[in-house]
Regions:
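Acidic, glycine-enriched active-site microenvironments
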Residues: 1-648
Length: 648
């Protein structure tokens, strides 16, 4: 907070340059909590005994540190140490450490810094060589890095931001905020930080430690999660020295244990309506709760999905939602998932009586849930993936008990459907405690399993129309193309995925054939548009008489546009406009005025703005507010679906 920041930088203050300066208004909470209630004895500060001066502050009702559970100072508090990659200590004096780190960063070294919620990997954001070294070591070839600025003034001196972005950057949550790079006039190595993108993820210091770091460095710094690509953020010294020793040249450690590590949260605002979209809900936002919600006397736990895992728990009259955990394919993430289940059970001193999971039989969350059912002897229910998405936004807006029917538009990359196919372009109708599927994008072939999500050109191959032979031959060698075409002839698994449709369009337009990180093709497509005029847009498809959407028409018409030399930006605008108008065609046909949106596709800021602009006069639109539209909301949706539709 501002008061602690002033003390931190005041030479005569007893907490001068003490990076763990906190009060009742600021400092870590969830990261250091072992059990409830939040009292010092229940946190990792229990072994740090307050000195007489800190104790006086703690017991003085007139002091802002009255009952501050994280209270400490240089005399009784947390110690820093700077070491090299071998573990050899270099410095331990606080002021000297930050000056040394600043010098190392300016020299091009990578520093692993243990912050209040886990390790960050930091380097000079103006040094292309250092950035590329970090990419190589972290095995992160293209995915953008977040940039830490010393102050709002420093950021605004380099690039313009909106009032909504400024408010979020200065909020207590202090997330990474994605901003446009248009008009950027600083010294960042833009192409190295965000390859192919015209946006930056920026944040401001949210701890005393980062405040002191930036005071000494003074120039922007890369600040990315301390992990190897795909694994969870690291939070203890032993793991950092073993797993990150090949990444960082030096380490800044401290001796406060972290129980619940958290990544930085990520948000974006749509350019026209400044609607907030949460991309990753973690530090600052999570865990959070909904309630009181007198749903049930049962204790209910929802295990979420497989990607962007979260857990929801209803142990009393409140629903608690965990932070983003990651993708369960990774061994360390799966361990954190199981640990979080155990943590929730211990914290609330309550074992679930009902377990909920996704219908996909291969999801590790579902498989683990079935083991827990046998172990705990509890009730088991599975909830279809896209119905969970729909239920998440319904629950956030308290729509289950209203009499007005709601159209659910759920678009994402993948989800196991009730018919055994891969859904992802779904329309549902909710009315009087019933949720039914009323439409979807036409099915097309699901090729090569999960590989399809990594290679947009496979989506194009599946949706290819007449005349594309030369284009496909330019993307595949002849042997590979023959193999895939043979697979298509024998394939029985279909998909309605809009996420994969985005991939197909990106490949068709020559934007991306292979994703190096999740959603890369769609993100690169969005970067081609900063503004649009609805009056200049045209649609590439209309809904069929049966209520399905002719996916192939969209691809065929875009291919024709490419042949006519229509600019890429115009085609992308038309594509997004097509998607938006199709939704309102369905709504008119169904005579529905209330529309709820969820699924990862609705992280596209331009699409969200188009929907709000087209629907502003005649429709009431609902989006996920306090949680991401992506699979982070599956656990919340599972629980909302159960208490409102299954239990009822």
């Amino acid at each position: 907070c501002d008061a602690c920041r002033d003390e931190l930088l005041e030479v005569k203050n007893r907490r001068y340059y003490y990076p763990f300066t906190t009060c009742t208004y600021c400092g870590p909470r969830w990261a250091i909590t072992n059990t409830f209630p939040f009292e010092r004895a229940h946190t990792n500060l229990h072994s740090f005994h307050m000195c007489p001066v800190c104790q006086e502050e703690y017991t003085n009702p007139l002091d802002r540190r009255f009952h501050s559970q994280t209270n400490s100072c240089p005399s009784c508090g947390i110690a820093l140490s700077l070491s090299d990659a071998t573990g050899k200590e270099i410095a331990a004096d606080s002021q000297g450490i930050f000056k040394k780190i600043a010098a190392l960063i300016r020299e091009g070294y990578i520093i692993g810094i243990k912050n209040t919620s886990g390790y960050l990997l930091c380097c000079d954001a103006q040094n292309a060589t250092a950035i590329q070294t970090l990419r190589n070591r972290k095995r992160r070839p293209q995915k953008p890095f977040a940039i830490l600025y010393a102050s709002l003034k420093q950021l605004q001196g380099e690039v313009g931001i909106t009032q909504a972005q400024e408010t979020e950057l200065l909020s207590p949550e202090r997330p990474i905020v994605l901003i446009s790079g248009t008009g950027y006039k600083g010294q960042l190595v833009f192409d190295a930080l965000a390859p192919g993108l015209n946006q930056l993820g920026v944040m401001l210091p949210y701890s005393g430690l980062l405040e002191l770091l930036m005071k000494e460095v003074q120039t922007p710094v890369v600040a990315t999660s301390g992990n190897i690509h795909g694994s969870p953020i690291i939070s203890n010294l032993e793991d950092a020295q073993s797993s990150l020793a090949q990444v960082a040249d030096y380490f800044l450690h401290h001796n406060l244990d972290i129980t619940n590590a958290q990544d930085d949260s990520v948000v974006k605002f749509t350019p026209k309506f400044q609607q907030k979209i949460i991309y990753r809900r973690s530090r600052g936002y999570a865990p959070n709760y909904y309630g009181p919600l007198p749903f049930s006397t049962e204790k209910i736990m929802a295990l979420g999905g497989h990607l962007k895992s979260t857990i929801a728990f209803y142990p009393n009259d409140f629903l608690y939602l965990s932070q983003y955990l990651g993708h369960l394919d990774h061994y360390e993430v799966f361990n954190r998932f199981t640990d979080t289940i155990e943590t929730f059970v211990q914290l609330f001193e309550a074992k679930p009586e009902v377990l909920l999971a996704d219908k996909h039989p291969a999801y590790l969350s579902t498989q683990y849930g079935k083991k827990l059912v046998k172990q705990w002897g509890v009730t088991w229910h599975e909830v279809q993936h896209h119905k969970s998405h729909f239920a998440s936004v319904m629950g956030e807006h308290n729509l289950f008990d209203q009499n007005t029917p709601v159209l659910g538009v759920i678009w994402d990359g993948t989800g196991y459907g009730d018919d055994g196919h891969i859904w992802g372009g779904e329309f549902f109708r909710y009315q009087q405690k019933k949720m039914e599927r009323i439409g979807h994008f036409d099915y097309y072939d699901w090729v090569a399993g999960d590989k399809m999500a990594n290679e947009p050109k496979l989506s194009l191959l599946s949706l290819a129309c007449e005349g594309m032979d030369d284009l496909l031959e330019s993307k595949f060698d002849s042997r590979t193309l023959n193999i895939y075409q043979t697979l298509l002839q024998k394939n029985s698994l279909k998909t309605s995925s809009v996420g994969r449709l985005f991939d197909a369009v990106a490949s068709l337009l020559g934007i991306c054939d292979t994703n190096t990180y999740e959603g890369e093709a769609a993100i690169l497509m969005e970067q081609h548009i900063e503004t649009y005029q609805l009056s200049n847009c045209k649609a590439y498809a209309v809904i069929s008489e049966t209520g399905t959407i002719p996916t192939s028409d969209i691809i065929r018409n875009i291919f024709a546009e490419v042949g006519r030399g229509v600019p890429r930006e115009a085609i992308i605008c038309n594509f997004l406009f097509t998607l938006a108008t199709l939704i309102f065609q369905i709504a008119r046909r169904q005579r529905l005025k209330h529309i709820a949106f969820s699924g990862g596709v609705f992280q596209n800021a331009i699409l969200v703005d188009m929907l709000k602009e087209i629907g502003k006069d005649d429709y009431i639109l609902y989006f996920n507010r306090n949680i991401s539209p992506n699979d982070e909301n599956i656990a919340l949706g599972q629980l909302m679906y159960y208490v409102n539709l299954i239990k009822q």
